[in-house]
């Protein structure tokens, strides 16, 4: 670790020493013990935001407060940035809303550590002393590639629903096993996901779908481990999906850029069309699901409707009049589902492209002015349509 401490960070630690020790904590420490040095550095100490502002006033270090209540701020110098958190205790309301209702600042690593989630994330590195502080034997669990709650799992997972999703994501990205009692607690506390915002669910699910390339040690099938954990823990209903488990017939085969489309298609197929394609997409991506913007929901609906219309063997002309612009994505899904149908639609698509056959108004070699010249008495809307 010592060899990866920059001169600017070392100097910052020396400034802190006037009032307290400065530690690196969390993902950077965990990953460094795995030989990975490609994550942001999180810092922690007993100093409050106001004390840090006073300490660094007049130096080259810049300070930007993130949350006074939580005691978090960003310290930067040039291109280097560090997130700092004051040692604290947290109290949560019932449910899993991911935000403490009460915060108390404390003075020791041991007290701060009790608010954290998993032992692997709970190793502190003292920058100046070049030594680790490990209150919950996290270094041993990191060596074992084991993800385990720091205390009784229920006390860790029942107060913050996002920790369940983070658990699945980290295990996927790092190739860690999850301790049995931690898995059981996640299952028992899964209802807390109902209190997590759609945006946070979206962030975690997308990270899981992309987990195969997160780190150099991430496995090529890492994302499938995460999705299978969703099945095991029965998490899908909390993403507004009409199923408890999903058959990943398509998701397991497509390239990363198409995985979200494939996942939704697999959810629809698993549900045996309990609701229409449009309804299911809207439910999954709407406010109670992944909270996508309306424009993106419409885009997903169009692609998924096109995919299922292709499976229903819609005639070529009708299909491409409706789905020509989205065919690249539909084709990627169809290729992994039915080689015969993919070949059929691809042949027609390439025929249209190679022969430059007009499908959309913008493909026509005339514009609104041409139309007006030959048909001057039409209503304005016809000219405007071609002008676009």
Q: What do the PLM-derived regions correspond to, one by one?
A:
Residues 1-388:
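Catalytic cores of the polymerase beta-like nucleotidyltransferase superfamily
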């Amino acid at each position: 670790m010592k060899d990866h401490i920059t001169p600017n960070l070392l100097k910052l630690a020396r400034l802190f020493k006037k009032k307290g020790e400065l530690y690196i904590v969390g993902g950077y420490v965990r990953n460094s013990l795995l030989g990975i040095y490609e994550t942001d550095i999180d810092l922690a100490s007993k100093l409050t935001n106001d004390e840090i502002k006073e300490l660094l006033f007049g130096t080259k270090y810049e300070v930007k407060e993130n949350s006074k209540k939580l005691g978090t701020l960003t310290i930067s110098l040039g291109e280097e940035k560090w997130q700092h958190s004051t040692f604290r205790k947290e109290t949560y309301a019932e449910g899993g809303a991911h935000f403490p209702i009460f915060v108390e600042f404390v003075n020791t690593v041991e007290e701060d550590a009790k608010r954290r989630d998993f032992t692997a994330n709970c190793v502190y590195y003292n920058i100046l002393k070049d030594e680790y502080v490990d209150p919950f034997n996290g270094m041993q669990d990191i060596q074992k590639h084991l993800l385990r709650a720091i205390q009784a799992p229920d006390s860790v997972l029942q107060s913050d629903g996002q920790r369940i999703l983070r658990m699945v994501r980290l295990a996927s990205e790092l190739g860690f096993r999850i301790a049995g009692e931690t898995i059981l607690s996640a299952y028992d506390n899964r209802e807390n996901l109902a209190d997590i915002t759609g945006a946070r669910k979206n962030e975690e699910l997308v990270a899981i779908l992309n987990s195969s390339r997160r780190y150099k040690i991430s496995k090529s099938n890492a994302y499938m481990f995460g999705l299978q954990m969703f099945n095991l823990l029965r998490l899908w209903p909390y993403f507004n999906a009409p199923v408890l488990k999903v058959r990943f017939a398509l998701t397991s085969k497509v390239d990363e850029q198409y995985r979200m489309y494939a996942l939704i298609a697999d959810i629809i197929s698993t549900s045996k069309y309990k609701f229409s394609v449009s309804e299911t997409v809207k439910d999954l991506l709407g406010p109670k699901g992944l909270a996508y913007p309306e424009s993106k929901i419409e885009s997903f609906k169009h692609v998924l409707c096109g995919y299922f219309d292709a499976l229903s063997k819609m005639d070529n002309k009708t299909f491409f009049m409706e789905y020509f612009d989205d065919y690249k994505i539909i084709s990627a899904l169809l290729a992994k589902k039915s080689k015969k149908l993919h070949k059929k639609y691809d042949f027609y698509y390439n025929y249209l492209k190679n022969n430059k056959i007009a499908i959309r108004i913008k493909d026509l070699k005339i514009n609104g002015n041409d139309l007006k010249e030959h048909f001057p008495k039409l209503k304005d809307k016809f000219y405007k349509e071609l002008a676009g």
